[in-house]
């Protein structure tokens, strides 16, 4: 444990941010997995709904800094391409 008060605070803040980032990334992975399952099952209407949800979550994660903006944009693009190929 750190001896300096500001360092102790930083440890607490980093722990909170790490927990939040881990939660957000887990939600993203789950949402993407559900989208991919819908596409593979051929359930295109459900896949479209899931894609909009994934886009929203990725945009929020990028806004919070959990995921880089370019990375989020690239993932959204690739998922949209995957849906369009399935159609």
Swiss-Prot record:
Role, per record: Binds directly to 16S ribosomal RNA.
GO CC annotations on file: cytosol; small ribosomal subunit
Gene Ontology molecular function: any one: structural constituent of ribosome
Annotated SUPFAM superfamilies: Ribosomal protein S20 (SSF46992)
Keyword presence, S-adenosyl-L-methionine: no
Entry keyword set: Ribonucleoprotein, Ribosomal protein, RNA-binding, rRNA-binding
Family in the record: Belongs to the bacterial ribosomal protein bS20 family.
Protein name: Small ribosomal subunit protein bS20
């Amino acid at each position: 444990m750190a001896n300096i008060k500001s360092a102790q605070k930083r440890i607490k803040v980093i722990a909170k941010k790490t927990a939040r980032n881990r939660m957000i990334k887990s939600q993203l992975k789950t949402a993407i997995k559900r989208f991919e399952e819908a596409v593979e099952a051929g359930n295109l209407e459900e896949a479209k709904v899931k894609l909009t949800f994934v886009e929203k979550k990725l945009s929020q994660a990028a806004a919070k800094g959990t995921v880089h903006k370019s990375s989020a944009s690239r993932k959204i693009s690739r998922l949209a391409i995957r849906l369009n190929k399935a159609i």
